[in-house]
A protein has these predicted regions:
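Extended helical coiled-coil dimerization/tether regions that scaffold
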Residues: 71, 134-221
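Short amphipathic C-terminal alpha-helix that caps PH/PH-like domains
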Residues: 42, 221-222
Length: 222
């Protein structure tokens, strides 16, 4: 997990240190104060990649740097310091393997999702692997292609595959639906069905009350 993030001369303030709590952290403030910027930097500290544009300090900033501490599954958590290199506008860090924080998921301000999986996104011997997977909102449902290769089938296809194959992932999905449901109106997975004329695949459905509702047509709140 990310334990600390210490910023110097990169935009939010001349000197800003955040000590993160072990589980839930709330960041509040008016528009334009840098809440999303802080989350972008937290993502970078955990994954050493950027979910969008890299953080660029103001031209007048002297010696901008980022210092952070990430606690992995094993080993001592040591501070990592990156000093901005203006010649190529990068934040260099040591080439050694970063700590293993586990899978990192970032729900971005634009409605998309970024996912970093150390088992799939970090291999020094295979630099051609994607640095991370960045999903637009529709790609979470419909799937993601990277460099002409299908890397994710999307939740709709996975849902039907898990359900028809009676796979353990479907049990986890059912439990997630149960936990997220209103007490008086539980959400349950319904039978897959064809939705659009001429479509060659089934889509997942939800049982909401006495009705079967295709997930693709469910309300935005659901």
């Amino acid at each position: 997990m990310l334990k600390t993030l210490h910023l110097k001369n990169i935009g939010l303030a001349p000197d800003l240190r955040v000590d993160w709590a072990p589980r839930l952290n709330l960041i509040t403030g008016d528009n334009g104060l840098g809440k999303s910027f802080l989350l972008d930097l937290a993502w970078w500290a955990l994954t050493r990649t950027w979910a969008g544009m890299a953080a660029l300090p103001p031209a007048a900033s002297k010696n901008p740097q980022i210092e952070y501490v990430v606690q992995g599954k094993a080993g001592e958590a040591k501070p990592v310091v990156s000093k901005f290199r203006r010649s190529d506008e990068t934040w260099p860090v040591d080439a050694k393997r970063p700590p293993m924080p586990g899978i990192v998921v970032y729900i971005r301000i634009d409605g998309g999702f970024s996912v970093w999986d150390p088992a799939r996104n970090y291999w020094r011997s295979d630099p051609g692997r994607p640095a991370a997977y960045h999903f637009a909102a529709h790609e979470v449902w419909e799937g993601l292609d990277v460099g002409g290769q299908r890397v994710c089938e999307g939740l709709e296809r996975d849902w039907v595959n898990w359900q028809e194959g009676r796979k353990p992932q479907f049990k986890a999905l059912e439990e997630a639906l149960r936990v997220l449901s209103p007490v008086a109106e539980p959400l349950r997975a319904g039978p897959p069905q064809r939705l659009f004329i001429g479509e060659g695949r089934d889509r997942p459905t939800l049982l909401i009350g006495s009705q079967t509702v295709p997930v693709a047509l469910a309300s935005a709140g659901v």
